[in-house]
């Protein structure tokens, strides 16, 4: 009987699992709606008083999105003011709802990935995950890897969808231009 050879294991394909990059930590949406006057406008003095009295330490180590769920007049500086109070405590702060927070967190972590370790490699980005990896993370990852990889695939090493193959270097035909 002949020995069974695992061709997938010996293929040299590197599996990259975005789920392994999933940053652990609580996600929190800071909603400005309760701070609005009659749910239509924000008063600067009221917001500043709130910011002065609020316990910002409760956001320590958390991923925070500053958002307003009401259709109201909220100036840009209000989001910035809250961010200046949250940022010293939070692991990450951005503007948006829960979905936008997740996309922003993944974008940050994908951009921190050391893509050089994938130079000239055959990479398959794992497709199945138990955690909510946002679609933009896959797109961002593709953009990061494309300049360095030999090939990029999606799925599992035993069943991949080819996405990209680096062009082969052109050979010098031996003749020189005159």
Kindly label every feature range from the protein language model.
Residues 4-5, 54, 112-115, 142-143:
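A generic local secondary-structure boundary/capping motif
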Residues 74-75, 103, 132-136, 161-165:
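Short active-site-adjacent structural elements
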Residues 63-69, 94-96, 122-128:
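Short glycine-rich or small-residue beta-strand-to-loop segments that form or flank ligand, phosphate
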Residues 115-140, 177-178:
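Extended, charge-rich low-complexity interaction segments
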Residues 78-117, 155-160:
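Long, charge-dense
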